[in-house]
Amino acid sequence: NKKKKVSKMDSGKHKRSRKRKFKSNSASNNGLSSNQFGRRIARQHKLVARTLGRTPPGIAFMGSARTRPGNPYYDVNIEAAKAVALLGFPIYHGGGPGQMEASAIGAAQGGAKSVALCLRLARKEEVFGPHDQAVWFDDFSPRVDTLRRFGSIAMVFFPGGIGTMHEAMSMIDNIMQKKAPVRPIIFFEPVADKPYWQGLFDWLKNVVMVVGLLKAEDIPFVHIVRSVDELVAVIKAQN
């Protein structure tokens, strides 16, 4: 009997498909598999739904954890949060020290609800400043998602470092890409003769826009303010 010749194409049909096994980067997921990490993220979102489900949207304040009372950034933040609280909006903040604590104090002084969205870090778990509710997160992403969701009236950025910059740029990009509702993104300059954010705006205008990677009309919702009165005016104009 003649053996039937099988073409390479035909023989490929009879081969068992091999499933590739992908190893998750356990180091980046704290030793968890991809499925375990996904479930952990989902649990944090469910916790937010249970804890803050009936809490109205408000104004999110962000800034450095490294400032202390007596620092003009800290002191002006208290005044700003108080003024915003008097408008009747809940204040959402990170629950940590520094600018986050100042936001909580201002919220309490203005009689508004203070909601702490805390991140578990190596240091002792502690909520800084007065607060009515607190939610603890194990990961950055669900915390940022919650700030984005509940800070839908406006988001105020006081001076901060890499974390604050990440939150600010992430929010701006989400709004630009229509992944989040438009709201004012406000950068607050607490000290008139020592600008903190102006350099960022100069870079966007004189470098990024000049080479065509951004247009002014892409970010009409981004503001820079230099006083509490200006901050209140921007928020009132949008609501």
Give short role names for the model-derived ranges:
Residues 1-20:
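Arg/Lys-rich, intrinsically disordered low-complexity tails that mediate electrostatic binding
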Residues 20, 24-117:
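Glycine-rich beta-alpha loop segments
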Residues 51-54, 83, 108, 125-129, ...:
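Solvent-exposed alpha-helices and their adjacent loops that cap or buttress functional pockets
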Residues 70-73, 165-169:
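Glycine/threonine-rich flexible loop motifs
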Residues 75, 98-159, 163-164:
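Acidic/glycine-enriched connector segments
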Residues 77-78, 108, 171-175, 202-205:
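Short, solvent-exposed amphipathic alpha-helical segments in soluble enzyme
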Residues 113-121, 158, 165, 172-200, ...:
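Short, acidic/small-residue loops that bind anionic groups at enzyme active sites
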Residues 196-239:
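C-terminal functional extensions of proteins
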